[in-house]
């Protein structure tokens, strides 16, 4: 298997570690049949790739085998933001788009990362017709292969509210986790995304809140409108534990 280094991966602080440990634990309650998990958002810049990458790392550090697929064929920033370095010191390599276009075989796009227990399929190069590639049956075959190699397959997808790609990706997944920027997405937008994903037959596992203002977190009515979707509301769990500890 080819090697891949992740050269820009900031360490999480205490709150971040607690959040992702909680999320990782909660995934185990989703059921043994939930292995292929799409991570998406309503808008761009809501932290879906941050969520995907850190969930991959946290699971791997806990001894859980995990594969990450960068399926944002339109606007992926993973290669640059995380400093992916391929064999030979190159900053670009064969990836998902190359495989789906029939340019290389499946084994050419699966990389062992420098994180033990974590493998990765990078995005590859930009393509003019990503939707056509994602509807290719080879995409589902790739996810099935990765699911046979790992305990979880995390699929970083484009935002649901912007393009139709995520709906196609969801068809090949067992569940969806939605990254939501706190105080930045309306309830109706989230409901629209929820409906669009559910129409594909892919269950929604929950939401993960980003950019949370802890000081005002517990009292905001705005948050309460999301609470029934927040099965994996890992920031909520972290805040609740520490808030209660401070009162003792």
Where do the protein language model's features map onto the residues?
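P-loop NTP-binding module
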Residues: 1-248
């Amino acid at each position: 298997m080819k090697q891949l280094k992740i050269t820009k991966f900031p360490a999480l602080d205490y709150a971040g570690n607690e959040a992702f440990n909680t999320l990782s634990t909660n995934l185990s309650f989703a059921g043994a049949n939930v292995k292929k998990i799409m991570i998406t958002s309503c808008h761009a810049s809501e932290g879906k790739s941050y969520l995907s990458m850190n969930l991959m790392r946290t699971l791997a550090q806990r001894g859980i085998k995990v594969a990450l697929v960068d399926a944002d064929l339109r606007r992926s920033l993973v290669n640059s933001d995380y400093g992916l370095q391929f064999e030979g010191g190159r900053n670009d390599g064969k990836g998902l788009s190359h495989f789906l276009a029939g340019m290389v075989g499946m084994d050419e796009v699966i990389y062992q990362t420098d994180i033990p227990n974590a493998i990765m399929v990078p995005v590859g190069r930009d393509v003019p017709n990503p939707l056509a590639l994602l509807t290719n049956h080879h995409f589902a075959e790739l996810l099935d292969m990765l699911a046979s190699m790992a305990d979880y397959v995390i699929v970083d997808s484009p935002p649901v509210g912007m393009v139709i790609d995520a709906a196609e990706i969801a068809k090949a997944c067992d569940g969806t986790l939605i990254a939501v920027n706190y105080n930045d997405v309306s309830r109706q937008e989230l409901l629209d995304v929820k409906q669009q994903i559910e129409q594909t037959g892919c269950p929604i596992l929950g939401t993960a809140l980003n950019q949370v203002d802890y000081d005002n977190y517990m009292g905001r009515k705005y948050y309460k409108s999301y609470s029934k979707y927040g099965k994996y509301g890992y920031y909520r769990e972290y805040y609740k534990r520490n808030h209660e500890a401070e009162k003792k």
